[in-house]
A protein has these predicted regions:
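Acyltransferase
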Residues: 128-145
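Histidine-centered divalent metal-coordination motifs
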Residues: 36, 85, 124
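Flexible gly/pro-rich beta->alpha loop and the following alpha-helix that scaffold active-site loops
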Residues: 1-34, 46
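Glycine-rich nucleophile elbow surrounding the catalytic serine of serine-hydrolase chemistry
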Residues: 36, 40-44
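A conserved active-site-flanking secondary-structure segment within enzyme catalytic domains
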Residues: 44-80
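Structural signature of beta-strand start/N-cap positions in the alpha/beta core
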Residues: 2, 31-33, 80, 98, ...
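Phosphate-binding/catalytic loops
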Residues: 78, 120-131
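Catalytic beta-strand/loop cores that center a nucleophilic Ser/Cys/Thr
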Residues: 68-115
């Protein structure tokens, strides 16, 4: 089984429903993909800072660069990704998390837990305008624990 924590308006501290509790409970045992607010919840749960993004990105496409690890395995860097957010997880990341994707301006677009299958992306792989979105989701669904 897998868990996907999808986007929503608001902040991980106040408007995430059960998302933070789900991450805390399952991150060691079940692969989790956090999208947008889901990534922000991951950053928050592991002690990171979620702050206003330098630019509002509502329905805008921008290049995302990545490390080629995890859900980004086999994908070109950069690729175009659709973004709908006004908040981001800010660097430096907590020690448990590593940066996996970023913008040219240095905004965190992807992160993952160093030990457990807990992965976040700030952009929307499910959007029609995101290149390789299906590949990202396929990589998540086929990755081992």
């Amino acid at each position: 089984s897998r868990i996907i924590i999808s986007p929503g308006p608001g902040t991980p501290e106040q408007d995430s429903g059960v998302s933070n509790d789900v991450i805390r409970h399952f991150y060691k045992t079940t692969p989790i993909l956090g999208v947008c607010l889901g990534q922000q919840c991951m950053g928050h749960v592991f002690g990171g800072t979620v702050t206003r993004a330098p630019r509002l990105m509502h329905g805008k496409v921008s290049p995302v660069y990545h490390t080629g690890k995890g859900v980004f395995y086999g994908l070109p860097s950069p690729f175009q990704a659709t973004r709908y957010h006004s908040l981001i997880v800010q660097e430096p990341l907590p020690p448990e998390l590593e940066l996996t994707a970023f913008t040219m301006e240095g905004e965190v677009m992807g992160l993952r837990h160093r030990e457990y299958p807990c992965i976040g992306v700030q952009f929307h792989p499910e959007s029609i305008l995101t290149e390789h979105g299906k590949d990202i989701l396929r990589n998540f669904l086929t990755m081992s624990r």
